[in-house]
């Protein structure tokens, strides 16, 4: 009873009043939250990313690629955004057998990186034999750096995050730092974990006074979380980067990547191995001289050799289409088609080589001193 005003409220009236106020507050809260979500242009992308991340984590939990299950309800929204970039090794078709001419690099990578992860008990008594915190693959374009990363993801059977650095840049102040922090907090929860950054020079290039404040803060935080004062030395979180411009990387980044592997242009012997690997399942004529092609293709990368063989294979299909009418090859089944199409000949490879040599001359990717002046 309110004696001064002479107005009294029964217990039921007070309860109804509180219920109404609570209902209005709840409606206002959820309405405001819905409006904020609608105003956020990345809301749909975030929702899809979280859904994909949950599917990937559930898929990995059913395999041996996670040492222990992760409670997805305990992951933050930012960690779920990063988890969207987790790679399932079963989805990768590249293995060590698909890489030719880099046996020394692969063997060293297995011994210094993969073995300490897979057989951790063998290296527990020494800090010197622990897996490095950073790995740098550098060399000319098209020489197999990304293929090595793919094969590593498949063969290590550990959590592998293919980090898209564009996700770390956000227009809202402070969001980039939260996402950067989520990269490492998620990796620690999923360890052992490898974080792969392709074209790492575009993200962690040398710092200077021209850097934007947000970019400089993000780089500093990334390095601090990677190997800083509060970094747990027992954590098995490895950063693997690939670049063809190692000179552009910050010195502090190079210090954090002690395991460096130069993936250079293949020599004649390596080119022969690459050509044999590319053509091993292709129909080739008896006159094909792989050794001669390997000798001619100096300064060609593995990617160039792949394109050379692809063009040569296209020539034989083109000849088939020229000698057969449309009605003829539309009604032809697969077996008859493969019997009718001729194999790849030496002439196809030489024609493809001349075409690619001309293209490389115009783009400046073939040394003038190496040209054959007929």
Show where each model-derived region lies:
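C-terminal engagement/docking regions of AAA+ P-loop ATPases
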Residues: 3-7, 295, 300-307, 317-374
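Generic hydrophobic alpha-helical segments
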Residues: 25, 35-38, 116, 229, ...
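Ser/Thr-centered flexible coil motifs
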Residues: 69, 75-76, 267, 286, ...
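AAA+ P-loop ATPase mechanoenzymes
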Residues: 1-108, 113-116
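A short, hydrophobic/aromatic-rich structural module that often spans a beta strand
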Residues: 54-58, 247, 257, 364-374
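Short, flexible/disordered secondary-structure transition segments
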Residues: 29, 33, 37, 42, ...
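Walker A/P-loop NTP-binding motif of AAA+ ATPase domains
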Residues: 2, 6, 85-300, 312
């Amino acid at each position: 009873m309110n004696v001064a005003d002479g107005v009294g409220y029964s217990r039921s009236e007070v309860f109804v009043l509180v219920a109404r106020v609570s209902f209005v507050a709840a409606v206002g809260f959820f309405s405001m939250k819905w409006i904020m979500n609608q105003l956020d242009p990345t809301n749909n992308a975030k929702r899809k990313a979280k859904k994909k991340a949950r599917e990937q984590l559930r898929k990995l939990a059913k395999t041996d690629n996670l040492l222990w299950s992760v409670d997805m309800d305990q992951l933050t929204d930012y960690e779920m955004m990063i988890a969207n970039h987790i790679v399932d090794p079963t989805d990768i078709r590249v293995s060590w057998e698909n890489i030719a001419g880099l046996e020394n690099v692969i063997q060293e990578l297995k011994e210094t990186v993969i073995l300490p992860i897979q057989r951790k008990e063998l290296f527990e008594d020494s800090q010197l034999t622990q897996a490095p915190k950073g790995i740098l693959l550098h060399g000319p374009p098209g020489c197999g750096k990304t293929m090595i990363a793919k094969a590593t993801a498949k063969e290590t059977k550990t959590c592998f995050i293919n980090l898209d650095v564009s996700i770390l840049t956000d227009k809202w102040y402070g969001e980039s730092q939260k996402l950067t922090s989520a990269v490492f907090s998620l990796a620690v929860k999923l360890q052992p974990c490898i974080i792969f950054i392709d074209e790492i020079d575009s993200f962690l290039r040398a710092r200077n006074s021209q850097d934007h404040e947000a970019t400089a803060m993000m780089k500093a935080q990334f390095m601090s979380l990677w190997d800083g004062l509060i970094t747990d030395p027992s954590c098995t979180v490895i950063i693997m980067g690939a670049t063809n411009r190692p000179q552009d990387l910050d010195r502090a980044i190079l210090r954090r990547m002690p395991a460096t592997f130069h993936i250079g242009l293949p020599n004649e012997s390596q080119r022969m191995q690459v050509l044999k690997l590319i053509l091993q399942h292709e129909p080739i004529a008896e006159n094909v001289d792989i050794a001669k092609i390997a000798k001619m293709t100096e300064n060609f990368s593995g990617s160039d050799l792949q394109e050379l063989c692809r063009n040569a294979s296209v020539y034989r299909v083109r000849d088939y289409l020229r000698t057969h009418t449309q009605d003829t090859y539309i009604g032809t089944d697969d077996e008859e088609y493969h019997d009718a199409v001729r194999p790849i000949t030496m002439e196809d490879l030489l024609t493809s080589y001349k075409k690619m040599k001309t293209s490389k001359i115009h783009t400046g990717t073939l040394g003038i001193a190496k040209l054959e002046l007929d």
